[in-house]
Amino acid sequence: FAHRRATVKRVLDDLEREGAEFVVGLTHQEIGEDEALAREFGDRIDWIVGGHEHVAQFLRVGATTITKADADAKTAYRIDVRPTAGGERPAFTATAALVELDKSVELDSDMVRHVATSLVRLATAIEGKTGRKLLDVVATTEHLLEGTEPTIRGRETALGDLLCDILRDRFDLDLAFVNGGAIRVNDDVPAGGNLRVYELEGIFYYDDKPVIFELTGREILGLLEKSVSQATLGHGRFLQVAGLRFSYEVAPDGKTRVDAADVTVRPAGGTEFAPLELDRRYRAATLDYTWRNGYRDRDW
């Protein structure tokens, strides 16, 4: 935040010299970082329109209002700002209303054309790379595959199990894990539904690659504790796993804890789950983002 603080201060100084009367901060960062921004510059920023989280939020920090709408064009905040008379510095009243973007809302023609063009480009790229068309059916589901962010980032899901099982089985490993933030589909595939190339491409938007490595049982325990440390907030660090089972506790103060006694592992080739051995080395796989950086820049 130190680097951002200097940048924000410079921009605010410029805006005030140019005569700005109502300042809106357009951000894409976690809510805690927006709150820190409001606390630091609250007398100079009237409103923060934020992103990053994918669920609607509304809060006030001092004199600053922070709003975030739902992702995937489900909602939008309409913010009305009106000047009021009097005072040395121009004053304003500002209100916000969360609007559901349902079928009653007219589509923007420019955006419709943009989406159509993007889908054609995507379909062409997929067919050139895989030989499959975007709407080709790959499989039919027997069970519900939950891919919405509140589930994939907060608890075990069949979709997460499937993805990690594929990764683990493909390389004959002890375990595999994928962070919920890497699973981008944000939708469910119903039981008895068709799983198309479109859905498969929507699961992983990033160009992630699998990484195989070894880690100790003690390191596994540490990963699991970090995985659930913000599970109640729907953070992308929550891990979907294969080859191991675990449970965690949430204390009254919101802090989470994973006990080693609540972790079991089914090593490659095994049929039974056994207690986690803290000093044993296990072979595992994950995606290269988690391997290279994970969430170190976010207290990972």
Residue ranges and their predicted role:
Residues 3-10, 22, 32, 110, ...:
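Generic recognition of stable, solvent-exposed alpha-helical segments in well-folded globular domains
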Residues 1, 148-155, 208-211:
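Second-shell loop/turn segments in exported
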Residues 83-192, 253-255, 292-294:
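A short C-terminal boundary segment appended to hydrolase-like catalytic domains
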Residues 63, 144-151, 204-207:
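Flexible glycine/proline-enriched surface loops and loop-helix/loop-strand junctions
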Residues 9, 49, 82, 107-112, ...:
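Residue-level recognition of well-ordered secondary-structure positions
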Residues 91, 161-300:
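Feature captures C-terminal
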